[in-house]
Swiss-Prot record:
Catalyzes the initial step of the lipid cycle reactions in the biosynthesis of the cell wall peptidoglycan: transfers peptidoglycan precursor phospho-MurNAc-pentapeptide from UDP-MurNAc-pentapeptide onto the lipid carrier undecaprenyl phosphate, yielding undecaprenyl-pyrophosphoryl-MurNAc-pentapeptide, known as lipid I. One of its GO terms (biological process) is peptidoglycan biosynthetic process. InterPro entries: Glycosyl_transferase_4, PNAcMuramoyl-5peptid_Trfase, PNAcMuramoyl-5peptid_Trfase_CS. It is an enzyme of class 2 (transferase). Belongs to the glycosyltransferase 4 family. MraY subfamily. The lineage of its organism: Bacteria, Pseudomonadati, Pseudomonadota, Gammaproteobacteria, Pasteurellales. Pathway: Cell wall biogenesis; peptidoglycan biosynthesis. It comes from Actinobacillus pleuropneumoniae serotype 5b (strain L20). The chain crosses the membrane at residues 21-41, 73-93, 98-118, 132-152, 168-188, 199-219, 236-256, 263-283, 288-308, 338-358. The gene is mraY. It catalyses: UDP-N-acetyl-alpha-D-muramoyl-L-alanyl-gamma-D-glutamyl-meso-2,6-diaminopimeloyl-D-alanyl-D-alanine + di-trans,octa-cis-undecaprenyl phosphate = di-trans,octa-cis-undecaprenyl diphospho-N-acetyl-alpha-D-muramoyl-L-alanyl-D-glutamyl-meso-2,6-diaminopimeloyl-D-alanyl-D-alanine + UMP. This is Phospho-N-acetylmuramoyl-pentapeptide-transferase. PROSITE patterns: MRAY_1 (PS01347), MRAY_2 (PS01348). NCBIfam families: mraY.
Length: 360
């Protein structure tokens, strides 16, 4: 929005030309989103308390979690507001890639909102009926994927980048739709499963979004894309603004979500953030890199799949409890130790992921 205003005002004062620079707008998007999150946080928490939108806790979970019962949830609303306002202000809204990510972000946020609402109303952790939840997640993902495919099917935007191999970039064609669908829906649910401890999901999200800001900038820059042997996707550079908005909103939310949390993001936050990360990975053609950098999300999801599969096949559990962060809690690890160690692991994986861009 401000890009259009600056383009008009630059004829009167060339200083407004600074708004045309992605780096400037990226920093401003981060600061704007963070400022909004910090500003509206107390009011959002107060209203959630008045509405009695409190967290429900599994009765078979760690005893330390019982004290969390009643803590305001659905705090992801403040994340969505911060990202939405910041992006609308600082991004070039003529860029279709921005709208694809926002569509998934708010679409998944709506599904998460309904899921959270039913958990609160029923006073249990069941939420929205699973088949309806996955139906709507799938519909939203497929609409976005078909749109992305229609825009980029004749360009490098449907290539698959394989880490460590610079000359291996197969053209996916129609299979792009299948892969992209699973990346978006899978990442959304993986982040959702990770969101079980104070700050556990939001900090890895911030780290991965920060890395994707760098990757989006390189992907949208012809010279850097050639230098790194990655696909050049002309519209991708503008995603830097959205990535930094996610980082800023995440930092603003972390202020209130750090241990001991004053508010939880709920499914309205975790499903939407995961969906946004998955969509960004698809747009910059780095789906496999997301698996590396978001390794904590992947392991959390796999732990649930393995636990359920093992119990159905052998009537035995692999972990004391799934997702795996609860396993470590039941082993006696204090919650802050689990959280910080998962943060450290994510930082290492993100750095490894960024290094693979050069080691190819």
């Amino acid at each position: 929005m401000l890009v259009w205003l600056a383009e008009y005002l630059v004829q009167y004062n060339t200083a407004f030309n600074v708004v045309s620079y992605i780096t400037f707008r990226a920093i401003m998007a981060l600061l704007t989103a963070m400022g909004i999150g910090l500003w509206i946080g107390p009011e959002v928490i107060r209203r959630l308390q008045l509405l009695k939108f409190g967290q429900e806790v599994r009765n078979d979970g760690p005893e330390s979690h019982f004290k969390k019962r009643g803590t305001p949830t659905m705090g992801g609303i403040m994340i969505l507001i911060a990202i939405g306002v910041s992006t609308l202000l600082w991004a070039d809204l003529r860029n279709s890639y921005i709208w694809f990510v926002l569509f998934v972000l708010f679409g998944y946020g709506a599904v998460g909102f309904v899921d959270d609402y039913w958990k609160i109303k029923r006073k249990n952790t069941d939420g929205l009926i699973a088949r309806w939840k996955y139906f709507w997640l799938s519909v939203i993902a497929l609409i976005a994927v078909f749109g992305i495919y229609a825009v980029g099917k004749d360009t490098a935007a449907t290539q698959l980048v394989v880490p460590f191999f610079k000359d291996v970039m197969p053209q996916l064609g129609i299979f792009f739709i299948i892969l992209s669908y699973f990346v978006i829906v899978g990442t959304s649910n993986a982040v959702n499963l990770t969101d079980g401890l104070d700050g556990l999901a939001i900090v890895p999200t911030i780290m991965v979004a920060s890395a994707f800001a760098l990757i989006a900038w390189a992907t949208g820059n012809f010279n850097f894309a050639q230098y790194l042997h990655i696909p050049f996707v002309p519209n991708a550079g503008e995603l830097v603004i959205l990535c930094t908005a996610i980082v800023g909103a995440g930092l603003g939310f972390l202020w209130y979500n750090t241990y001991p949390a004053q508010v939880f993001m709920g499914d309205v936050g975790s499903l939407s953030l995961g969906g946004a990360l998955g969509t960004i990975a698809v747009l910059v053609r780095q789906e496999l890199l997301l698996v590396i950098m978001g390794g904590v999300f992947v392991v959390e999801a796999l732990s649930v799949i393995l636990q359920v599969g093992s119990y159905k096949l052998r009537q035995k559990r692999i972990f004391r409890m799934a997702p795996i962060h609860h396993h470590f809690e039941l082993k006696g690890w204090p919650e802050p130790r689990v959280i910080v160690r998962f943060w450290i692991i994510t930082l290492m994986l993100v750095l490894i992921g960024l290094v693979t861009l050069k080691l190819r």
